[in-house]
Amino acid sequence: MRLVIARCSVDYVGRLKAHLPLATRLLLVKADGSVLVHSDGGSYKPLNWMSPPATLRVSSPEDVDLELGVAEQWTVQSAKTDDRLIINIHEKLSETSHDLGVDPGLIKDGVEADLQRLLADQIETLGTGYSLIRREYFTAIGPVDILARDGDGATVAIELKRRGDIDGVEQLTRYLELLNRDPLLAPVRGIFAAQQIKPQAKVLANDRGIDCVTLDYDAMRGVDDSESRLF
């Protein structure tokens, strides 16, 4: 993990265009190739980023940029598309690198952990012919909650949340990008499963080709037999 605090401007060029004017920001360069641009307020989310796989090229600025005070230019190129993140660094205030090693991943507790266990035991809840490959399928960027096969034998990656929001869809998207590079698993499609899924998350999931499934936690635990209820 490389952390750089710098005065910089940022441009995203590709399927969409975005510009961040000159300001002091935190640049995170991760071992998986992703680059994230953070500010000190507004949101815990990055202002802009490039997802892996991507390559970072550092170059000297052109004369016109030198005149504007640019000392170094970063070009982060997506390996899959023509999208680029261009970071013009005017001044580095701090820079440090750390080897964080292999992360064991998020250890879930409470309802999410129970949902994972229950769905793994009742994988047919997702459809006829579904079978479990394994829970906590490890990847270089973290564990996939459940990896399964559908009735046609295709691989399915399942992300579980108690309350599903956009961040969960983004997380599953990253897993799918990585898993689909494995010829032994591809093609891999995604299912975003939760007790409640926010409308914005459903829209984003649909745009990404990810199915959304609402889980009845009580019914899965055998507490609430929905078929026997009068109301």
From Swiss-Prot:
GO CC aspect terms: cytoplasm
Domain of life: Bacteria
Principal location listed in the UniProt entry: cytoplasm
EC number: 3.1.-.-
Top EC group: hydrolase
GO molecular function, one term: single-stranded DNA endodeoxyribonuclease activity
Coiled-coil residues: none
Pfam families reported in the protein's UniProt record: NucS_C, NucS_N
Places the protein is found: Cytoplasm
InterPro entries: Endonuclease_NucS, NucS_C, NucS_N, NucS_N_sf, tRNA_endonuc-like_dom_sf
TM region positions: none
Keywords tagged on the record: Cytoplasm, DNA-binding, Endonuclease, Hydrolase, Nuclease
UniProt similarity note: Belongs to the NucS endonuclease family.
Function: Cleaves both 3' and 5' ssDNA extremities of branched DNA structures.
Name by which UniProt lists this protein: Endonuclease NucS
Gene that specifies this protein: nucS
